[in-house]
Amino acid sequence: MRSIINNEYKCLICETPSHETHLQTHNIFYGNGREALSEKYGCWCYLCARHHIIGGNAVAVHFNKKLDKKLKAHAQKRFNEVYPDLNFTQIFGENHL
């Protein structure tokens, strides 16, 4: 499934393009089977390694709760726009709005 978050091959956070860095896919919702749901509904994005896992507490989404919550809220809004007939909370079991 294509991403409903960003389809350009660049980091969603810093917009560094793929030819300048190695991009990684980040499933925005994870745990308890949510990775598969993220992939199924396109709730994933490209991130550079710094913003994904190696940037530490200040910048990496896996360590920065504020950034994680911001991405989750953005993804839920996009989900509601792309899938108006589906209930996000029923599917993912969480609400970020």
State each model region's role.
Residues M1-Q24:
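Short cysteine-rich loop/turn motifs with clustered Cys
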Residues P17-H19, V59, P84:
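Short, solvent-exposed coil/turn linker segments
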Residues T21-Q24, C43-L47, A75:
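Amphipathic alpha-helical interface surfaces
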Residues L23-G31, C48-G55:
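Histidine-centered catalytic micro-motifs
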Residues F29-W44:
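Short linker/helix segments within small regulatory modules
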Residues W44-K69:
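Short Cys/His-centered divalent metal-binding micro-motifs
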Residues K72-L97:
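Short flanking/linker segments adjacent to small metal-binding domains or redox-active Cys/His motifs
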